[in-house]
Structure formats: C-alpha cells, structure tokens
C-alpha cells in the first residue's frame, strides 16, 4: 500500500473511490458533479486528500482535510470530514494509516489540532487513534504538540 497527497492530476484515481463513498451514504451516483466538486476543492485549495492505493495502483481509501482558523487561538487547525476505505482485508490498518498521514500533515503545517466530524459508526476508530469527543462541539478532537 502507498499513501500520497492527491493533486489535480490524481482526480481520476480518486473519482471512483469518492463515488463509492457517496453511494455508501445513500447518495445517487453522479460522476460529473463529483468530478466538479473534487476539481474545485483542489483547484481553490479548499481541502486536500490523502489517497491509499494498493499494489495495482487502485485507490482503496482516502481522507479529506479542510483547513480551519481559530481567531481565539490565533492559529490554523485541520478538520477531517470524510474518510473512507473500501471493504478490504486490512481495512482497520488502512484507516489507521490514513489517520497517521493526516496527523503527520498537521505537524508539517505547524498546527497542533485535528478535529473530526464523522459518522457514529467511525467513533471507535477515532477513539483508538487518540481522539476525544468534545460533547460541547459534538466533534472529536486530537491535540498534537508541534
């Protein structure tokens, strides 16, 4: 398995995986709109993706990060809103690798906070990666030291 930060030229690798993610949450297939959504997120630096690919270069998982700013803390932090792994024998390990890559990126950008707003069925995965539920904000948070 390889993990890498997606760029615009990787959208065709990400597109079928992102469509599978949307369909897993009950959304109708719409590759044209999905392509436009992904293209615009990357083009305007509104979010970034890390993609996991298997030995055949097929995308098997991704995590999407959005930059956030805290006026009170005077710093940037990152938010995971989407993480998805295809049904796979090593699904737990792939999720962990994607979260680890996100943590590394947060360190790289000299941020010290990563929050996640995910489906309830992913709560245990977040907790196993050190995230704590902040009931006031209904988000999982992970503080990282730079």
Curated annotation (Swiss-Prot):
InterPro entries, per database record: Acyl_CoA_acyltransferase, Bact_Acetyltransf, GNAT_dom
Domain N-acetyltransferase: 1-146
Organism domain of life: Bacteria
Signal peptide: none
Any one GO MF annotation of this record: acyltransferase activity, transferring groups other than amino-acyl groups
Key words, A-Z: Acyltransferase, Transferase
Gene3D superfamilies on file: 3.40.630.30
Cited PROSITE patterns: GNAT
Protein name as catalogued: Probable acetyltransferase HI_0677
Organism: Haemophilus influenzae (strain ATCC 51907 / DSM 11121 / KW20 / Rd)
Tagged with keyword Transcription regulation: no
């Amino acid at each position: 398995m390889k993990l890498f930060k997606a760029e615009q030229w990787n959208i065709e690798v990400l597109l079928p995986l992102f469509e599978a993610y949307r369909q897993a949450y009950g959304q109708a297939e719409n590759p044209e709109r999905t392509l436009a959504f992904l293209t615009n997120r990357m083009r305007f630096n509104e979010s970034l993706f890390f993609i996991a690919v298997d030995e055949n270069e097929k995308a098997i998982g991704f995590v999407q990060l959005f930059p956030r700013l805290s006026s009170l803390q005077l710093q940037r932090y990152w938010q995971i809103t989407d993480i998805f792994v295809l049904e796979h024998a090593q699904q737990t390990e792939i999720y962990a690798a994607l979260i680890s890559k996100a943590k590394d990126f947060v360190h790289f950008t000299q941020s010290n906070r990563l929050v996640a707003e995910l489906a309830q069925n992913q709560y245990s995965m977040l907790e196993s990666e050190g995230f704590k539920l902040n009931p006031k904000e209904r988000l999982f948070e992970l503080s990282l030291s730079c």
